[in-house]
C-alpha cells in the first residue's frame, strides 16, 4: 500500500512542518483573535491542527476569482501572489500585513522574512524552535495598527 495513515504525528517531518510551533500556538495564542501569516508550504499542516491560516496548498481558493464578490462582479484579492511575494520579499511585508490585518507571523527560522522581522522594531520574536520562528506584530498608536 502507498497510503500510510497518520498516527500521533508519526509520519510528519518536524523539519518540514511546524509540529512544535503548532502546539505552542494552540497553548499560547488566542485562535479567535489570531490573524496569522504563514508561508505556502506548511499552511495545510497548520489547518490540520485547527489553526487559521493565511494560505494553504489549495492555491486556487486564494486567487482573485474565488475571493471576490461574484454577485457584483468584483474581483477579489490575489492572496496567493501576495503570500509568495511576502515570503520572497518582493513587496513591503509590513504594508501587506497591515492590509490583511496580520498580527502574528510564522516563518522558517532561516528565511529572508525571519531575518528581516528579527531586525524590525515593529515585530517581536515570541517563539523559536530552530526550525520555525513566530513573531508578534507590535501595534503602535502612531501608525494606527
Regions found by a protein language model. Give the residues of each.
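Extracytoplasmic
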Residues: 2-145
